[in-house]
Design a protein with these regions (language model features):
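Basic/polar, cationic surfaces and motifs that engage anionic cell-wall
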Residues: 2-12, 18-23, 97-166
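Structural preference for beta-strand elements that scaffold enzyme active sites
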Residues: 28, 88-90, 147-149
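Cell-envelope and extracellular/periplasmic
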Residues: 35, 72, 82-100, 116-120, ...
Length: 166
């Protein structure tokens, strides 16, 4: 499959923290909360050191701009799960620093636009949220579907925060 990157990106700083080309086609999107109102430039700097051992495909700053840190063809190191990251486009979103880790409206609206863009470029017509870890991880998306997953299903974290569940 030929992978493309989002044209919504206004800032790029590629991180060395990735596993190279994916071993699974894209059929998941995993949004995250940054736990801070980090700009796309700050996120790029956070993901730059090899010692960080973390990255995401995209980030959305508090102003709604989109940054790219790992191209979609490559697996980011974002959700504490190799299996999830191999098939998910991962998106860090600027958020409040305390639970429920709310996103500003411009961040949320940009997240929606980015999800739609990812779906369209990958030939998907349905974005699914099942809300249940077992159901989601056991679900085999149809060729026209992408399913949402969350970081808290793979690590002892609140991410993406309870605001996303409201």
């Amino acid at each position: 499959m030929a992978y493309t990157n989002s044209l919504l990106v206004s800032y790029t700083k590629l991180s060395p923290n990735h596993s190279g080309q994916r071993t699974h086609s894209i059929d998941r999107i995993t949004p995250h909360c940054v736990v801070g109102q980090c700009s796309v430039e700050t996120l790029g700097n956070i993901f730059l050191p090899v010692s960080r051992q973390a990255s995401s495909n995209y980030g959305i700053g508090p102003d709604g701009r989109v940054g790219m840190y790992v191209e979609e063809k490559n697996r980011s190191w974002c959700s504490s799960s190799n299996a999830n990251d191999q098939r998910a486009v991962t998106i860090e979103c600027a958020s409040d620093t305390t639970e429920p880790y709310a996103f500003r409206d411009v961040v949320y609206q940009t997240l929606i636009k980015l999800c739609v863009d990812i779906c369209k470029r990958n030939g998907k017509t349905k974005l699914l949220w099942l809300g249940d870890k077992a159901k989601t991880l056991n679900y085999n998306p149809k060729p026209d579907e992408i399913i949402l997953t969350v970081h808290r299903w793979f690590a002892n974290k609140s991410c993406p925060g309870n605001w996303m569940y409201a």
